[in-house]
Every structure is written in C-alpha cells, then in structure tokens.
C-alpha cells in the first residue's frame, strides 16, 4: 500500500527545536535539533510499551516529557516505507505512536504539530555508520535507534531548509541587456 509522508516546510511552525522519532516494536529512538533547526543530535532510546489497544503507557509519557523538556515546536515520526513508497508492516506502529503523542499534546493545550517524515533507509544508514565506527549491531541496538532518529530528523531539517529558502531567479547574474557579464 502506498503511504505518503508530510512535506517539510508546509505549515511550518517557525524557528525552534524539532524532535525526530524512530518507532520500532521494542524501542523508540529519539533525536532533537538545535534551536536553529539545522542539526539533529541523538537524545535517548525509550523502551516501547504502548500497543494498539489500551491506555498510553510510560513510553508515551516519556515522549511527551521530552517534547516539553526540549520546548519542541514540531515532532517528526519516521514513516517506514520501501524505495517505491509502499508502507511496511511498521507503518501502523509509527502512526499509532504519532496519534497518541499528538492526542496527549493537544489534550494538554499544546498546539505542536506531529508529522510523519520519510524514513527510507534510515536504519540501514545508521547501522552502516555505527558499524564503520566499530559498534556492532547487537551491541549498539539502542544507539542504532537513536542514530536512525537522527537520520529521520536530519533529512526533515535539510528538506525544510530547502523548502523555506527564497527561490532564486538568477537574474542578478545578467546585465541589463540579459547578457552574462564578463
């Protein structure tokens, strides 16, 4: 099934920190941006507890607390898709966590957007980077979740920056006759 992520820069909340979440069935990797929304950094790995039914558990409590601790203006939840844009089985998990975090923030009177960001290949990239630095996949699973969250968030931040840049008309490179000077 085709799934689509949200568009970075669309309905942008402006300057401020963003959080990125890599939702798995066992753990949720968390990353945060700097205040300028240029650089993503790992924060922590939250054990996954909340399922599809029942109340929010400690994982949702912790994620909402991190949003508040970092004064985040936007939360990006990785949407797991393949290279063709088809959703994997993990899409339901990502959407469930996004829904629960959004609901809790809204119920607390906080108008913080929770968006779904493209997650293609983020865990692969994170695993390769950690392996290259000498960390085994088994030893670094918690770190891999954080690194994947960093990849999700950094991809969003880069796309946001491009989307918000003023579009150049390139006319400044030409003289008044339309010729390139020099």
From Swiss-Prot:
One of its GO terms (cellular component) is cytosol. It is found in: Cytoplasm. It is an enzyme of class 3 (hydrolase). Keywords: Cytoplasm, Hydrolase, Nuclease, Ribosome biogenesis. InterPro entries: RNaseH-like_sf (IPR012337), YqgF (IPR005227), YqgF/RNaseH-like_dom (IPR006641), YqgF/RNaseH-like_dom_sf (IPR037027). Its main location: cytoplasm. One of its GO terms (biological process) is rRNA 5'-end processing. Its EC number is 3.1.-.-. It holds the Pfam family RuvX. GO terms for molecular function: nuclease activity. The keyword Cytoplasm applies. The keyword Lyase does not apply. It comes from the Bacteria. Could be a nuclease involved in processing of the 5'-end of pre-16S rRNA. NCBIfam families: RNAse_H_YqgF (TIGR00250). PANTHER family: POLYNUCLEOTIDYL TRANSFERASE, RIBONUCLEASE H-LIKE SUPERFAMILY PROTEIN. Belongs to the YqgF nuclease family. HAMAP family: Nuclease_YqgF. This is Putative pre-16S rRNA nuclease.
């Amino acid at each position: 099934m085709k799934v689509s992520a949200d568009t970075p820069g669309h309905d942008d909340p402006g300057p401020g920190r963003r959080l990125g979440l890599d939702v798995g069935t066992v753990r949720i990797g968390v990353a945060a941006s700097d205040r300028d929304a240029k650089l993503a950094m790992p924060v922590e790995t939250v054990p996954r507890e909340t399922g599809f039914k029942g109340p929010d558990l400690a994982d949702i409590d912790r994620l909402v607390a991190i949003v508040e601790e970092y004064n985040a203006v936007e939360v990006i939840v990785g949407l797991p898709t393949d290279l063709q844009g088809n959703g994997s089985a993990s899409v339901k998990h990502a959407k469930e966590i996004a829904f629960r975090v959004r609901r809790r923030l809204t119920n607390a009177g906080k108008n913080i957007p929770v968006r779904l960001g493209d997650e293609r290949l983020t865990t692969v990239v994170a695993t390769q980077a950690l392996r290259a630095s000498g960390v085994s996949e088994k030893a670094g699973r918690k770190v891999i979740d954080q690194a994947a969250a960093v990849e999700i968030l950094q991809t969003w931040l880069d796309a946001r920056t491009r989307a918000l840049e003023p579009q150049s008309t390139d006319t400044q490179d030409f003289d008044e006759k339309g010729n390139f000077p020099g």
